[in-house]
Amino acid sequence: MLLLPQKDWHWKYNDSYGVLSVSLGSEIEFLTAYKAKSLIPDALSSMEFNISHAKFYMSLLDKLPKTLTLTDAAVVQIALNATAAHFMLTPQMPKSWFFDTSEVCVYSDVGKVFELKCQKQRALVLVVENTLQSALVMLLSPECVLSGAKTLGQFETIKVMHNRLHPLRAQRHVVAA
């Protein structure tokens, strides 16, 4: 069952775990992947989960199952982390040099899923913010090794130029006649 936004939802910084969280009522608190150093100053205090946040979250609840085969719990987890990333993270500069250039020109839009190729590995990413030349993407894969010293963890974000986004490989289904 998908969690739908309620008027008592709100953002708060969870000091015990050192991450941004979403209070989903009096009983449930969802912990995002985002630590204080990556958050905007307002995210360190209690904030309403407002209409803009709810619309963004709901659009992802709608888009994700059309692209990926996921459980309802995974869709909610991705959508809440992506909403936090879109509204609560500090701006980033592109770091495209970690990734291979795509041979295909893609239309990048918020909520679309792409692959990044880095050191012969493929990483699944979700666009959470889009500009004219670049996109802020959130890692859906468990991890992506960027270099010997840097690894991107699941739900972490990185900004890349559009020419680094590779379309998802088409699934081929063989039907016996």
Swiss-Prot record:
Q: Which organism is it from?
A: Shewanella oneidensis (strain ATCC 700550 / JCM 31522 / CIP 106686 / LMG 19005 / NCIMB 14063 / MR-1)
Cite the InterPro entries for this sequence: ZapC (IPR009809), ZapC_C (IPR048372), ZapC_N (IPR048373)
Protein name, UniProt field: Cell division protein ZapC
Give the record's keywords alphabetically: Cell cycle, Cell division, Cytoplasm, Septation
Q: Its biological function?
A: Contributes to the efficiency of the cell division process by stabilizing the polymeric form of the cell division protein FtsZ. Acts by promoting interactions between FtsZ protofilaments and suppressing the GTPase activity of FtsZ.
Its main localization is cytoplasm
An individual GO BP term:
FtsZ-dependent cytokinesis
**What family classification does the UniProt entry report for this protein?**
Belongs to the ZapC family.
